[in-house]
């Protein structure tokens, strides 16, 4: 069984259990911030900074992290958005992390999870997310389209994550505003930064925002993403392990590169 299959099996169990529960995030009025608007106004590569305690590929990264403290550091360093891992079993995150972060910052917050059901989208929105992630590798195309439509009707922005040319082809059938190209193969967890370069050339970047995800460590990595047509990068482990956060942010915030199809 692949890593992804194992995660999805567990996620289905979680969803089934969740439907028997009632979660109350309280009466709050968290404004929905537009990530798309921020990206389109930026003159340099935008950065989505991720809060990630652990992962199946890296094990424990920083288990004792205070998500609010880390989120505030990210915002002060210049993050355009914050990604919060909410998967509990494999990434040691939670919806409580998402709620606390969304209340503490004034930039968009992404709920990063393996979403397979509408109830997860409801929970993400209720906890304060303004963006969610839908992974093509985790969903049949028809189900992906249903969840995409459901999320956008709730006023959420959606990152459609792909890793292969076939997934990208399927994603483009719904003309998404944002495509996330994951350099990490979710079946093997291997990383190849050339994935963004190879897939981005198939996307009209005048119509669709590209985000390069995974493996971003150096200015050269960020430059490769920008030259490939990405307007943003998602960075997790590099920042979670950083002892010089502001410096690392500045290194990765490279100029945008105009590219036409």
Curated annotation (Swiss-Prot):
It is an enzyme of class 4 (lyase). It catalyses: 1-(2-carboxyphenylamino)-1-deoxy-D-ribulose 5-phosphate + H(+) = (1S,2R)-1-C-(indol-3-yl)glycerol 3-phosphate + CO2 + H2O. This is Indole-3-glycerol phosphate synthase. The keyword Ribonucleoprotein does not apply. GO terms for biological process: L-tryptophan biosynthetic process. Belongs to the TrpC family. Its EC number is 4.1.1.48. Gene3D superfamilies: Aldolase class I. One of its GO terms (molecular function) is indole-3-glycerol-phosphate synthase activity. NCBIfam families: PRK00278.1-3 (NF001371), PRK00278.2-4 (NF001377). HAMAP family: IGPS_B. It comes from Oceanobacillus iheyensis (strain DSM 14371 / CIP 107618 / JCM 11309 / KCTC 3954 / HTE831). The gene is trpC. CDD domains: IGPS (cd00331).
